[in-house]
């Protein structure tokens, strides 16, 4: 057996998320089917760094798996890409130690969220951005995001469907910038881990701060109250990208 670490990108639009589900097209399912074809029927299980939801994209998802035989990394890259659909690209393949695990070896992740501005939805980027047609003070958002940096209890920002009890996470960076070319604002969050829907809830809250509907330091209040209902909104899946996983 040879142990591989593979980095890939995908357009999440036509996937029912990353994780295998019965009778659904998923990223994990497509990967495992391709690898099983390469082994001529011997099942290959793939571990991912995390589960992305339906409609969420990845610029740098990481998987790991054991493969029977010893294929050079570059050959694995080419072989996998030859079996990928148009909405998945294998970016890099590496042979790693057997104890490497895409999820459990990860030290941190970086997510990006794109928000399209303008009153009307652009039909050509609607599957790749969120959309916010209301006024925004980006400087207010910049101030607010500084309150996220550090170690906090993110109970208010975790979707009710999650099963993880410990909701304390550390955020190393939280930024927002304007892209005048695309008329978008782009959020980035880098932390040691993220709860279910956490980034999308943080973005929805930040947009309400930028719109003046919330106090500029409302993140601090939401940390204290530990109440998901008070954070309210969740930004659409379409604007979210898993940008990078750190090891």
UniProtKB/Swiss-Prot annotation:
Stretches assigned to coiled coil: none
BP-aspect Gene Ontology terms: tRNA pseudouridine synthesis
Species lineage: Bacteria, Bacillati, Bacillota, Bacilli, Lactobacillales
GO MF annotations, alphabetized: RNA binding; tRNA pseudouridine(38-40) synthase activity
EC number: 5.4.99.12
Protein name: tRNA pseudouridine synthase A
Annotated function: Formation of pseudouridine at positions 38, 39 and 40 in the anticodon stem and loop of transfer RNAs.
InterPro entries xrefs: PsdUridine_synth_cat_dom_sf, PsdUridine_synth_TruA, PsdUridine_synth_TruA_a/b_dom, PsdUridine_synth_TruA_C, TruA/RsuA/RluB/E/F_N
Species this chain originates from: Lacticaseibacillus casei (strain BL23) (Lactobacillus casei)
